[in-house]
């Protein structure tokens, strides 16, 4: 199939991943510039014709979250006004996903607001990875393709020999049990759960309470969709080590790693943290304990399948490793 009417553009948040995707699918990145006026307003210029093209924009809404989100909205508007046939947003990390419901009175549902903004701007399709809450897909009236990073993480641990009954996959909270179970199925391991109680007065903090499952004398693999300040994952790792785990590894799809995250990880019982490159990490943030693997091949294959109108279901395989 001809790719002459397929365009891939990168905005500011993760140009390194966009370059890898471009190389994977053999399509050069589109020419565009993003700049800010002196008052902080964002201006986007598309420097080539995209009339009649199927355009993909790659941008994670990581820090600075609001600027990166506005870049997407402005770019979509520019593409629509330039007569793109369709506009698909590839958002490896979907920011504001933690605000997916009203947990208390008078709270917003910001992940739904972001969905509304993308649709109003003119987005025809969203391609994303490991949403914080899978039901966010239902906030959209356009197609949402929801990829999973667990097979890539499973492949890494399989190559390290961390499989079988001597290994336990651990969810750091009850909400991540489904994710942990999928990874455990890949690695043929049992699972355990950390029972925690999150503080209602302090943001981004939690208290580990109990371990459900047998981890004594086992190597443990913690898995989460995202790590922000790393408080939860580090407390969980320390609790596992104190309970008799022989080694503790951690993994996540989205390395937000804000605030004291790097110090927390460095000073924790975690031996190695495996993350995907949905969020760009500069070299100075890749400390010895962190290893990053690329999701570019998976995203590239998804883009080609969408363009060729082929099913994405083979990309969701969780029962076998590469």
UniProtKB/Swiss-Prot annotation:
Enumerate the subcellular locations listed in this protein's record, separating them with semicolons.
Cytoplasm
What pathway or pathways are given for this protein in its record? Metabolic intermediate biosynthesis; 5-phospho-alpha-D-ribose 1-diphosphate biosynthesis; 5-phospho-alpha-D-ribose 1-diphosphate from D-ribose 5-phosphate (route I): step 1/1
Q: Where does ATP bind?
A: 39-41, 98-99
- Name the cofactor(s): Mg(2+)
Q: Which UniProt keywords apply?
A: ATP-binding, Cytoplasm, Kinase, Magnesium, Metal-binding, Nucleotide biosynthesis, Nucleotide-binding, Transferase
Which catalytic reaction applies to this protein?
D-ribose 5-phosphate + ATP = 5-phospho-alpha-D-ribose 1-diphosphate + AMP + H(+)
Binding-site positions, D-ribose 5-phosphate: 198, 224, 228-232
Instruction: Identify one Gene Ontology CC term for this UniProt entry.
Output: cytoplasm
User: EC number(s) per UniProt?
Assistant: 2.7.6.1
Gene Ontology BP term (one): ribonucleoside monophosphate biosynthetic process
**Superkingdom:** Bacteria
Question: What does UniProt list as catalytic?
Answer: 196
Entry GO MF terms: ATP binding; kinase activity; magnesium ion binding; ribose phosphate diphosphokinase activity
Cofactor comment text = Binds 2 Mg(2+) ions per subunit.
List residues binding Mg(2+) 1. 132
The answer to whether keyword Transferase applies is yes
Residues annotated to bind Mg(2+) 2:
173
Q: What is known about what this protein does?
A: Involved in the biosynthesis of the central metabolite phospho-alpha-D-ribosyl-1-pyrophosphate (PRPP) via the transfer of pyrophosphoryl group from ATP to 1-hydroxyl of ribose-5-phosphate (Rib-5-P).
Which PANTHER family does UniProt cross-reference here? RIBOSE-PHOSPHATE DIPHOSPHOKINASE FAMILY MEMBER, RIBOSE-PHOSPHATE PYROPHOSPHOKINASE 1, CHLOROPLASTIC
As for family, the record states: Belongs to the ribose-phosphate pyrophosphokinase family. Class I subfamily.
**Assembly information from the UniProt record:** Homohexamer.
What's the protein here called? Ribose-phosphate pyrophosphokinase 1
The gene designation is prs1
């Amino acid at each position: 199939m001809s790719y002459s009417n397929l365009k891939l553009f990168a905005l500011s948040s993760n140009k390194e991943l966009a370059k890898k995707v471009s190389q994977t699918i053999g399509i050069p990145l589109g020419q565009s510039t993003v700049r800010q006026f002196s008052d902080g307003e964002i201006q986007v210029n598309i420097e080539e014709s995209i009339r009649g093209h199927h355009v993909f924009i790659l941008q994670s809404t990581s820090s600075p979250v609001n600027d990166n989100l506005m870049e997407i909205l402005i770019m979509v508007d520019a593409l629509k006004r330039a007569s793109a046939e369709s506009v698909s947003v590839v958002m490896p990390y979907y920011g504001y996903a933690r605000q997916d419901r009203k947990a208390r009175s008078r709270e917003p549902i910001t992940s739904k607001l972001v969905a509304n903004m993308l649709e109003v701007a003119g987005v025809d399709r969203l391609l994303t990875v490991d949403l914080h809450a899978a039901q966010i897909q239902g906030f959209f009236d356009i197609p949402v393709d929801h990829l999973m990073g667990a097979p890539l993480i499973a492949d890494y641990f399989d190559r390290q020999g961390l499989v079988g009954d001597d290994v336990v996959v651990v969810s750091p909270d009850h909400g991540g049990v489904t994710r942990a179970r999928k990874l455990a199925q890949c690695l043929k391991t049992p699972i355990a759960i950390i029972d925690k109680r999150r503080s209602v007065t302090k943001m981004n903090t939690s208290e580990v309470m109990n371990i459900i499952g047998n981890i004594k004398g086992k190597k443990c693999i913690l898995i989460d969709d995202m790590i922000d300040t790393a408080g939860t994952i580090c407390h969980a790792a320390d609790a596992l080590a104190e309970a008799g785990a022989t080694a503790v590894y951690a993994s996540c799809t989205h390395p937000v790693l804000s605030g004291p995250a790097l110090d927390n990880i460095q000073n924790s019982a975690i031996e190695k943290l495996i993350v995907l490159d949905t969020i760009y990490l500069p070299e100075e943030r890749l400390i010895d304990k962190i290893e990053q693997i690329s999701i570019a091949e998976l995203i590239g294959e998804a883009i080609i399948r969408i363009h060729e109108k082929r099913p994405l279901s083979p990309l969701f395989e969780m029962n076998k490793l590469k």
